[in-house]
Each structure stands twice: as C-alpha cells, then as structure tokens.
Amino acid sequence: MAIRIVGVDLPQNKRGEIALTYIYGIGRSAAKSVLDKAGVDRDIKVKDWTDDQAAKVREVIGAEYKVEGDLRSEVQLNIKRLMDIGCYRGVRHRVGLPLRGQSTKNNARTRKGKKKTVANKKKATK
C-alpha cells in the first residue's frame, strides 16, 4: 500500500528521511525535523511505517510546512510581483536572463535557451 502525503506517493523502498524529499518544499533537513517531531525513526523504510506513523507525519507536515501547490503558487506570485514592480530581478526574469550577476557574454545557455544563429555580414572590400 503506497503512502500518500499531500498528493505525493512516497517511494516504498526508501528510508523515510529520503522519501520525504520527494515532496516539493521538503529537503533533507526539513525531512529530518519532520520525522523527529512525528516520533518516527529516520532509518525505517516507508513500507514499514504503520498507519499511525504515517498519520503523524501527515499531521506535522500539514501544520508546519507550506508544500507542493501552495508553495509553487507562492513562488510564482513572488516572481510575478518582481516583474510587476519592474525591479532589476523582475526585468531579468521577464527577458529570461540570469538574475544574480552572472556574465552572459559567453555562457548562460541554460537560461538563454538554444543558440540562435546570426547570418554573417559580408566583409567590406577595401
């Protein structure tokens, strides 16, 4: 039986600490603190959790963390706000360039996308 927490099926064969990181918004340290607060051993695999342990983990995540859809929408709203106020970071988001001061003369291919070839200008004859 798969354990579903906030709409995500946790992998059965992984330890609880690792399995919780499949939830958007929960990393390794958050997963450790969730399991500690819920009183679940970190090293137990998800398939060995009891229904009571799964319910406790669900309860802790629901009460203390903003995850999945809520977090995604908050991040999107933050980016939209930056673009609306027209600050530097918002402008860089809008034109699809790096935000944090990286040089774009040679690299930044991930952010800029695939190369666009520009036709060569014919050299002027002397």
From Swiss-Prot:
<dbReference type="GO" id="GO:0003735">
    <property type="term" value="F:structural constituent of ribosome"/>
</dbReference>
<dbReference type="InterPro" id="IPR010979">
    <property type="entry name" value="Ribosomal_uS13-like_H2TH"/>
</dbReference>
<dbReference type="GO" id="GO:0005829">
    <property type="term" value="C:cytosol"/>
</dbReference>
<feature type="compositionally biased region" description="Basic residues">
    <location>
        <begin position="108"/>
        <end position="126"/>
    </location>
</feature>
<dbReference type="Pfam" id="PF00416">
    <property type="entry name" value="Ribosomal_S13"/>
</dbReference>
<keyword id="KW-0687">Ribonucleoprotein</keyword>
<dbReference type="GO" id="GO:0000049">
    <property type="term" value="F:tRNA binding"/>
</dbReference>
<dbReference type="InterPro" id="IPR019980">
    <property type="entry name" value="Ribosomal_uS13_bac-type"/>
</dbReference>
<dbReference type="GO" id="GO:0019843">
    <property type="term" value="F:rRNA binding"/>
</dbReference>
<dbReference type="InterPro" id="IPR027437">
    <property type="entry name" value="Rbsml_uS13_C"/>
</dbReference>
<dbReference type="GO" id="GO:0015935">
    <property type="term" value="C:small ribosomal subunit"/>
</dbReference>
<feature type="region of interest" description="Disordered">
    <location>
        <begin position="98"/>
        <end position="126"/>
    </location>
</feature>
<comment type="function">
    <text>Located at the top of the head of the 30S subunit, it contacts several helices of the 16S rRNA. In the 70S ribosome it contacts the 23S rRNA (bridge B1a) and protein L5 of the 50S subunit (bridge B1b), connecting the 2 subunits; these bridges are implicated in subunit movement. Contacts the tRNAs in the A and P-sites.</text>
</comment>
<dbReference type="InterPro" id="IPR001892">
    <property type="entry name" value="Ribosomal_uS13"/>
</dbReference>
<keyword id="KW-0689">Ribosomal protein</keyword>
<comment type="subunit">
    <text>Part of the 30S ribosomal subunit. Forms a loose heterodimer with protein S19. Forms two bridges to the 50S subunit in the 70S ribosome.</text>
</comment>
<keyword id="KW-0694">RNA-binding</keyword>
<protein>
    <recommendedName>
        <fullName>Small ribosomal subunit protein uS13</fullName>
    </recommendedName>
</protein>
<dbReference type="InterPro" id="IPR018269">
    <property type="entry name" value="Ribosomal_uS13_CS"/>
</dbReference>
<dbReference type="GO" id="GO:0006412">
    <property type="term" value="P:translation"/>
</dbReference>
<comment type="similarity">
    <text>Belongs to the universal ribosomal protein uS13 family.</text>
</comment>
<keyword id="KW-0699">rRNA-binding</keyword>
<keyword id="KW-0820">tRNA-binding</keyword>
